[in-house]
Every structure is written in C-alpha cells, then in structure tokens.
C-alpha cells in the first residue's frame, strides 16, 4: 500500500491509495546473531532466543532486548507496526518465544496460554549431583522485589510445581529435564536451589 509492505488483513484503504498484491514473501530479511525467526504470519512471530539476550525491556536495558530488536524489524514494513510481549524467558535462558503483532492476539494468547502451551520443558545444568533420578518440587513462591522466596506451606505466595528428571551426572554437575506445571518468576532457579 503506497509502496509500504502491509500484512494486516484489515488495513483501512482510502481512495487514491496505490495497492499492489504480491505472492512473494516479505523482502525485508531478518538477521541477528541472538535471534532467529522460526515462524511469522500477520498475527505473531515465533523466535529462537539465544542466552544472553533479555526478552523484554527493563528499567536499565531498553535496546538490547528481543522485544526492541523485533520492534525494529516490524517497523521496516510500516512505521506504526510493533510487537507485543506474550511471555518471557530469563536473560541466560535460550529457547522458543512468541510475540504478538497486535494487542488482540496478545490478549488471546495470554488469556489462553495454559490451553495453548500445555507442555513446558527445559533442559538445565545444575551444580551438584542430584540425589534422586526424578521427582516433583511443590512450593509457594513470593516475589520480594530483590529475590523470590519459597515456602513448603501456603504462606500467601503462588503455588509452583516443577517436575524434574536427571538425565546425566558428571564432574559435580547434573543435566536435568524440567517440566513446569506453573510458570512463576525464577521458579526453576528457586526449585533447583531448594533441592541442594
């Protein structure tokens, strides 16, 4: 539309606008050493984020984030385009992330997240030799701004459940597969620390 690539299905057209239709993919290539686009359509972008990159902006870091990088990418097709955060991954966590291209999609994905993403598994290396081959950690986590506290009884925190399986032990470390029933801030870190 008027020499701008437009993928929005309900983009409002006005008399006098020049419209061209192409079956070719968007010519704006995306290349970034910390992000790889795995899937993209008019509603969402699915990326593989490498460790070391924040997923969203913080008070201290606005630009070196997946959110900022993807915002710059979608603005190449139209200056008003932007992306919307659906979920987060910690800076030192690599994995698959999903960002919405509009607020309606963001709300739909967030409101139905546990129905859409029913299996969340992580592979992690932890210090120490795990005593058990598998088990479940169940505790109540409370975000206390500077740290997240864990309690084995309901102390007003949020119930958090992590299932774990030891894949391998070597040289004082354990390779773990972790399956989350809940997705709380720092859940994996706090639950693994509680196991010793």
Where do the PLM segments sit?
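RNA pseudouridine synthases
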Residues: 1-196
